[in-house]
């Protein structure tokens, strides 16, 4: 992981200057018509449009797969989902769209920066706001259309060093415990973090930490942890870059948040990971040290309540549901967006 630090810091520097705007709200005739229809009316048009064929969906969420199965069960419309990681997903979509090839009807994506620059700006993906959502969803969540909010949070294994009881408490209280050096009091070594070069929302998270709001939070947390004011260093543009560099040097990479969640639940006490909170649903209901159970995990942002983790306890991001400009089945795509944003 250490060799990625200079590259990641440089990437953060570039991204910080091009934060996503409110997004495009481009539509075609089918989408403009679909926005006037109720969900029931959309489903009726979708059935007529698709017939016995199959709608194509691309996404990177296991929750999308479950939503699609439920949608098919409810409507009878067949849907095929291709699940890929961020990098492959954007690459395959871009390649197909650039060659004007059909690949998908609906797409579920995270990472607002790449969505804007690679998909919305060239009009490869179009925005559809369901009639029901237009009445009930905040405007900021409709352009582009947000399907769901997700949280990535710090978690740690709460067993004591003997592995006999859940007695480890208030273990992570300040984010500088995850940076700094091993000589720092309360230092936590080897927190697990999905590599930002393959998980775009993690890169966006690091970029966020270089902005004034989070620089201010990190500065306060630094003083609370080290009991002294932060003095600017020539090696870093600001304290956000310092935390990022030290955190990445101290952390270990994992390839899957779901696997990391399971590994943390089964690991020794004090093991820390930053993962998608939703992944706890996949843990087995096993009891005891070294077993895969949510009871083995503590989430500092919840544990500390109003006190919160000094600095931050994780971050929140959106996933967006979009319709392909060259969709074969645009009404079906719109019906699926409507289902995901209101029923799934």
Residue ranges and their predicted role:
Residues 2-9:
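Sec-dependent signal peptide recognition
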Residues 13-17:
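C-terminal motif of bacterial Sec signal peptides marking the signal peptidase cleavage site
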Residues 18-27:
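Bacterial lipoprotein signal-peptidase II cleavage site
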Residues 39-47, 51, 60-78, 285:
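Short, polar/charged alpha-helical segment
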Residues 55-69, 80-94, 102-262:
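Extracytoplasmic ligand-binding site segments that recognize negatively charged/polar headgroups
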Residues 112-118, 265, 271-302:
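A ligand-binding cleft/hinge motif common to bilobed small-molecule-binding domains
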Residues 134-137, 148-153, 241-247, 292-325:
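Periplasmic-binding protein-like
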Residues 153-160, 207-211, 316-332, 340, ...:
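A bilobed periplasmic-binding-protein/Venus flytrap-type ligand-binding module shared by bacterial periplasmic
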């Amino acid at each position: 992981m250490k060799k990625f630090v200079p590259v990641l810091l440089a990437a953060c520097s570039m991204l910080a200057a091009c934060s996503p705007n409110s997004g495009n709200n481009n539509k075609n005739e089918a989408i403009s018509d679909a926005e006037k229809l109720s969900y029931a009316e959309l489903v009726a048009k979708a059935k007529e449009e698709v017939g016995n064929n199959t709608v194509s969906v691309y996404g990177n969420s296991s929750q999308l797969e479950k939503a699609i199965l439920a949608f098919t069960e409810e409507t009878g419309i067949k849907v095929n989902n291709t699940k890929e990681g961020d990098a492959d997903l954007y690459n395959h979509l871009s390649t197909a769209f650039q060659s004007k090839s059909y690949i998908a009807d609906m797409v579920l994506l995270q990472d607002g920066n790449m969505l804007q620059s690679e998909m919305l700006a060239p009009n490869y993906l179009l925005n559809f706001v369901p009639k029901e959502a237009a009445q009930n969803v905040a405007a900021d969540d409709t352009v582009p259309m947000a399907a769901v909010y997700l949280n990535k949070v710090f978690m740690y294994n709460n067993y004591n060093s003997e592995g006999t009881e859940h007695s480890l408490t208030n273990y992570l209280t300040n984010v500088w415990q995850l940076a700094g050096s091993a000589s720092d009091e309360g230092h936590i070594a080897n927190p697990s973090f999905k590599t930002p070069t393959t998980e775009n929302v993690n890169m966006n998270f690091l970029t966020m930490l270089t902005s004034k709001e989070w620089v201010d939070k990190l500065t306060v947390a630094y003083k609370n942890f080290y009991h002294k004011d932060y003095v600017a260093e020539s090696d870093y543009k600001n304290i956000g870059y310092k935390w990022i560099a030290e955190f990445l040097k101290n952390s270990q990479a994992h390839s899957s948040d779901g696997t990391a969640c399971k590994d943390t639940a089964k690991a020794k006490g004090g093991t820390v990971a930053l993962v998608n909170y939703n992944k706890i649903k996949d843990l087995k209901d096993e009891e005891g040290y070294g077993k895969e159970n949510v009871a083995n995990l503590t989430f500092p942002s919840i544990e500390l309540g109003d006190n919160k983790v000094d600095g931050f306890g994780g971050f929140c991001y959106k996933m967006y549901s979009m319709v392909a400009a060259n969709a074969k089945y645009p009404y079906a795509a719109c019906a699926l967006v409507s289902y995901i944003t209101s029923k799934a």
